[in-house]
């Protein structure tokens, strides 16, 4: 099993990617929030990459919602990459909570990068 990781990468296209690997919950949510806030404070568009995340709970969903709201207020792009064959539990959590309609959730990281670079973070 992959260890839980939170990695921040800045792309040449001016978009930051926060990639979550493994399981994320109440214990990792504050660290995810800190990284999201750090990126958005710079006015940088953001992609949350969940393609390698096997589990997220409601505390992580709250952090994602707060990040999307902050991106919207700063008028910077925000998108989520779920992966073509994303982990079913993560996809289901986003579907059940209705968050797939709240911010852009795209099947591939490259699509999420393009969406975030366009400045659109969902309404």
Ranges and model annotations:
Residues 1-52, 66-123:
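STAS-like cytosolic regulatory interaction modules
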